[in-house]
Amino acid sequence: MNSENIIEQAFGKLQIYIKPKEKVQAENLLHRLRSRQLYRELVKYAKEDHLINASVYQTHHGYSLHGKISSRNVELANEDLSMCVELIDEKEKLEAFCIKHADLLRGKMIVFKPVEFWQIK
């Protein structure tokens, strides 16, 4: 395939590292009764904000923000082991997402990387 068949577009990728046990602060009684996991809320908000892609990846071994090394046991989930919420879109839209949801993202490890989005003709 030659490059004439590929349309390139500059995008960005955010990687937000959080722990699976992190919850969204309850705003009312209904939310207190039904706990909301932060990673699910971030994906929901990404969809509402029309970002092109949102994915969640579970890690198996590692650490984040200088914390202790954790591993995932086959039989038991480790609520302290980091997971990654990955968002892809234009840099400006990712910046707007971070500003809009700053209360949820404050204190989290967030990595931005420029990427190319390819469409095949």
Can you describe what each PLM-predicted range is?
Residues 1-121:
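Positively charged, small/polar-rich N-terminal and surface patches that mediate targeting and assembly
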